[in-house]
A protein has these predicted regions:
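Positively charged, small/polar-rich N-terminal and surface patches that mediate targeting and assembly
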Residues: 1-99
Length: 99
């Protein structure tokens, strides 16, 4: 099994739609076994700090999208996932043992 992890920001958009929603829709359409979107508390990277505080409200938090499925399935989807994420985030892969 393979795990693809995508790190983006909550406010990232593509064609006027939130990127994390586009990614989840894409994964459902391609019948991926499972995916979870995690909200981060704080973070930073090449696009600077991920979290912004406005009058006590946290916005634009980092998001982590974990995707798990068979290696052959996810490897075939990687080019499309990279194209969707583009320069908005980071895509990593690693093998996992599901117990």
């Amino acid at each position: 099994m393979l795990c693809v992890t995508i790190r983006i920001k909550r406010n990232d958009e593509l064609n006027g739609k939130r990127l994390h929603k586009l990614l989840i829709d894409f994964l459902i359409q391609n019948k991926v076994a499972g995916s979870t979107v995690w909200t981060g508390v704080d973070g930073f990277g090449k696009r600077k700090r991920s979290t912004i505080q406005l009058e006590g409200i946290t916005i634009n938090m980092p998001l982590i999208i974990e995707i798990i499925d068979e290696k052959s399935k996810l490897e075939s989807l990687l080019p499309s996932l990279k194209r969707l994420v583009n320069d908005n985030g980071l895509v990593t892969i690693h093998e996992v043992d599901v117990v």
